[in-house]
Amino acid sequence: MGKITFFEDRSFQGRCYECSSDCPNLQTYFSRCNSVRVDSGCWMLYERPNYQGHQYFLRRGEYPDYQQWMGFSDSIRSCRLIPHAGSHRMRLYEKEDHKGVMMELSEDCSCIQDRFHLSEVRSLQVLEGCWVLYEMPNYRGRQYLLRPQEYRRFQDWGSVDAKAGSLRRVVDLY
């Protein structure tokens, strides 16, 4: 079980809301979010309701302002607790519909370009565990939660292009 607390103001001030499960609409609990405390679990925060918009991956720790989680604004409107998995495995494809060259991955990758000579990923399959895909190397830029399923094109994971810079396994000790 996870636990996350949202605060309207920076440095854990102002009205707060504690959450322990997925919530598709946080708007009724607070109007803005400027700081977050994650007591347990790994979470994906979303800029808009129903798990839409920019995504932000947070693990256990304190985030005194939204820049700490690479946020673009103080808008957090939904959140999802990411289930813990023991093992991780995924396949990256250079073309849509799982075609073209395939690379398999079971560990974090700080630079997809250096490791696989790819700057774009057009489809992928998450076989085990949850992952976060970052648009830039070294775990920077836009973030996308990847859960076990098939993604036949980059739009399936919520991206507007096929840019893929790095991948990180979602790992947390509850």
Swiss-Prot record:
Q: Which organism is it from?
A: Mus musculus (Mouse)
**Repeat listed as a keyword:** yes
Stretches assigned to the Beta/gamma crystallin 'Greek key' domain: 2-40, 41-83, 88-128, 129-171
Protein's UniProt name = Gamma-crystallin C
Changing S11G does what?
In strain: CD-1
Q: Which GO terms describe its molecular function?
A: structural constituent of eye lens
Q: What is known of its domains?
A: Has a two-domain beta-structure, folded into four very similar Greek key motifs.
- A GO BP entry: eye development
Instruction: State the similarity comment.
Output: Belongs to the beta/gamma-crystallin family.
| Keywords (A to Z) from UniProt | Eye lens protein, Methylation, Repeat
Please list where the region (Connecting peptide) is annotated: 84-87
User: What does the protein in this record do?
Assistant: Crystallins are the dominant structural components of the vertebrate eye lens.
Q: Does the keyword tRNA-binding apply?
A: no
* Entry-annotated residues carrying S-methylcysteine: C23
Q: Give any extra note attached to this record.
A: There are six different gamma crystallins identified in mouse lens.
